[in-house]
A protein has these predicted regions:
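A short, proline-enriched helix->beta-strand linker immediately N-terminal to the Walker B motif
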Residues: 158-162
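Helix-to-loop junction immediately C-terminal to a conserved catalytic motif
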Residues: 62
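Conserved ABC ATPase signature
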Residues: 139-143, 147
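Conserved ABC transporter NBD signature motif
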Residues: 70-81
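Short helical segment in ABC ATPase nucleotide-binding domains corresponding to the A-loop/adjacent helical element
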Residues: 102-110, 120, 231
Length: 263
C-alpha cells in the first residue's frame, strides 16, 4: 500500500559522507561503510535504536571527529575539521551565562571580516528570526529553556552556514515550545531566502522526524550501517493526526528493532 514514502532519493549534494568507518579507542567498531548525502534545500533525519551512534555520526559529519576510513565532503571538498560553514546545534543548550543574548550570538561571527557594529546588527537580526526580537540584552539566567535554545540556534544562523547539524535540538523543551520552534526553523531555512541550506538532524522522536524530514536514513546493526533510506512524499503541512501520517509512523517504528551484531 502506498503510504507516502519511497525507497529512492535524488540529491544535489551539499554535504556528503562516503564509506565512513569508525571505532572507539577501546577497539569497539561503531560504523561500517556509512554513506549519507544532504541535498540542497533538504531536511535530512537520521534515526536508529538508542546507543547506535547517531550523535557520534553527527560529530564526524561536522569535522569534530576523524573517521578511521572514508571521507566527508562539503560542496565536493574534503572536510577535515570544524568550520563555520557547518554549524552543530547540540542537544544540551549551550549558552554562556556571562554574555547577553546578542553577545552569545556574536561568538559565531568572530572569524568574519565584520566591525563590532555590524556583528551587533547581525546578532539582533538572527535573534529576531527565531522570535527573540527585543530580547537581545537578556542574560541566560533571565531566559526560559526554550529562549536559550533559540539563542543557540540564532548563533548558528548568524554564521551563515551551508549545513545545520542538529543533535536532538528539541529534546529538553516542552512540546508546545518545541512545536513552535520546529516550525520557525523550517520556515526560516526553507522559505526560499536561503536555497543552499541543508539540515541533518538526529532524533528519537519519530513524530518530529516525520513532520520535518524530506529524507530519512535508518541506522542499525553492530557495527552500525545504513539499513534503509526513504523519501517522505507527504504534502506539507503534515498533520500528525491523519491516517497517512500514522501509516508512515508505523513503518518507521518497524525499523527500530534492537541492533544485532553482524556475523
Amino acid at each position: 500500500m502506498e503510504v507516502g514514502i519511497k525507497d529512492q532519493i535524488a540529491t544535489n549534494s551539499i554535504l556528503e559522507a562516503e564509506g565512513i568507518y569508525f571505532s572507539y579507542d577501546n577497539g569497539y567498531d561503531v560504523f561500517e561503510n556509512i554513506n549519507i548525502e544532504a541535498g540542497q534545500g533538504k531536511f535530512i533525519a537520521i534515526i536508529g535504536p538508542s546507543g547506535i551512534g547517531k550523535s557520534t555520526l553527527l560529530r564526524i559529519l561536522g569535522g569534530f571527529l576523524k573517521p578511521d576510513r572514508g571521507t566527508v565532503r562539503l560542496l565536493g571538498k574534503p572536510l577535515y575539521e570544524p568550520i563555520p560553514e557547518v554549524a552543530l546545534i547540540h542537544q544540551s543548550i549551550v549558552t554562556f551565562p556571562w554574555m547577553d543574548a546578542k553577545e552569545n550570538v556574536m561568538l559565531s561571527m568572530k572569524t568574519k571580516d565584520m566591525s563590532k557594529d555590524e556583528m551587533v546588527e547581525k546578532a539582533k537580526e538572527s535573534l529576531s528570526r527565531v522570535g527573540l526580537d527585543g530580547f537581545e540584552d537578556l542574560y541566560p539566567k533571565e531566559m526560559s529553556g526554550g529562549m536559550r535554545q533559540r539563542v543557540a540556534i540564532a548563533r548558528a544562523f548568524a554564521a551563515d552556514p551551508y549545513v545545520f547539524l542538529m543533535d536532538e535540538p528539541f529534546a529538553h523543551l516542552d512540546e508546545l515550545t518545541a512545536e513552535g520552534l520546529r516550525q520557525d526553523i523550517y520556515n526560516i531555512l526553507f522559505s526560499g531566502e536561503t536555497p543552499l541550506k541543508s539540515v541533518i538532524m538526529v532524533s528519537h522522536n519519530l513524530t518530529e522526524v516525520l513532520e520535518l524530514a524530506d529524507e530519512i536514513y535508518i541506522l542499525n546493526n553492530i557495527p552500525a550501517t545504513v539499513v534503509g533510506k526513504v523519501q517522505v512524499t507527504m504534502a506539507r503541512p503534515r498533520n500528525p493526526r491523519s491516517d497517512e501520517f500514522n501509516a508512515n509512523l508505523d513503518m518507521l517504528y518497524s525499523y527500530l528493532t534492537p541492533p544485532r551484531k553482524k556475523k
